[in-house]
């Protein structure tokens, strides 16, 4: 069995990588991918903590987090497709400019 500290350190590293990608990248698709990495890091922390204490709650939270991530990804990708069709770019700086 993997020790609790190793699993939580891995989850923290993944979360920080996702947060860095979310803050640094200006492309909305990469920001969505970084958000997915952050959700998976939190789900990994639930799994590790649940297996350490022998409780199934971590696995239940993992299923909830994965279903939430799937819904978020499908809605996000649909919005990105519509945005790309209208503006022909996914750069957040050009999208945030107002027309008028």
From Swiss-Prot:
<dbReference type="GO" id="GO:0048038">
    <property type="term" value="F:quinone binding"/>
</dbReference>
<protein>
    <recommendedName>
        <fullName>NADH-quinone oxidoreductase subunit K</fullName>
        <ecNumber>7.1.1.-</ecNumber>
    </recommendedName>
</protein>
<keyword id="KW-0520">NAD</keyword>
<comment type="function">
    <text>NDH-1 shuttles electrons from NADH, via FMN and iron-sulfur (Fe-S) centers, to quinones in the respiratory chain. The immediate electron acceptor for the enzyme in this species is believed to be ubiquinone. Couples the redox reaction to proton translocation (for every two electrons transferred, four hydrogen ions are translocated across the cytoplasmic membrane), and thus conserves the redox energy in a proton gradient.</text>
</comment>
<keyword id="KW-0830">Ubiquinone</keyword>
<dbReference type="GO" id="GO:0005886">
    <property type="term" value="C:plasma membrane"/>
</dbReference>
<comment type="similarity">
    <text>Belongs to the complex I subunit 4L family.</text>
</comment>
<feature type="transmembrane region" description="Helical">
    <location>
        <begin position="4"/>
        <end position="24"/>
    </location>
</feature>
<dbReference type="GO" id="GO:0042773">
    <property type="term" value="P:ATP synthesis coupled electron transport"/>
</dbReference>
<dbReference type="GO" id="GO:0030964">
    <property type="term" value="C:NADH dehydrogenase complex"/>
</dbReference>
<dbReference type="InterPro" id="IPR001133">
    <property type="entry name" value="NADH_UbQ_OxRdtase_chain4L/K"/>
</dbReference>
<feature type="transmembrane region" description="Helical">
    <location>
        <begin position="60"/>
        <end position="80"/>
    </location>
</feature>
<keyword id="KW-0472">Membrane</keyword>
<dbReference type="InterPro" id="IPR039428">
    <property type="entry name" value="NUOK/Mnh_C1-like"/>
</dbReference>
<keyword id="KW-0874">Quinone</keyword>
<feature type="transmembrane region" description="Helical">
    <location>
        <begin position="28"/>
        <end position="48"/>
    </location>
</feature>
<keyword id="KW-1003">Cell membrane</keyword>
<dbReference type="Pfam" id="PF00420">
    <property type="entry name" value="Oxidored_q2"/>
</dbReference>
<keyword id="KW-0813">Transport</keyword>
<comment type="subunit">
    <text>NDH-1 is composed of 13 different subunits. Subunits NuoA, H, J, K, L, M, N constitute the membrane sector of the complex.</text>
</comment>
<keyword id="KW-0997">Cell inner membrane</keyword>
<dbReference type="GO" id="GO:0050136">
    <property type="term" value="F:NADH:ubiquinone reductase (non-electrogenic) activity"/>
</dbReference>
<keyword id="KW-1133">Transmembrane helix</keyword>
<keyword id="KW-1278">Translocase</keyword>
<keyword id="KW-0812">Transmembrane</keyword>
């Amino acid at each position: 069995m993997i020790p609790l500290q190793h699993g939580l350190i891995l989850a923290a590293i993944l979360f920080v990588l996702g947060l860095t990608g979310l803050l640094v990248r200006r492309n909305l698709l990469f920001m969505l991918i970084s958000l997915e990495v952050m959700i998976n890091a939190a789900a990994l922390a639930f799994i590790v903590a649940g297996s350490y204490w022998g409780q199934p709650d971590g696995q239940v939270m993992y299923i909830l987090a994965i279903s939430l991530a799937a819904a978020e990804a499908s809605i996000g990708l649909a919005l990105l497709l519509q945005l790309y069709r209208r503006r022909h770019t996914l750069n957040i700086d050009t999208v945030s400019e107002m027309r008028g």
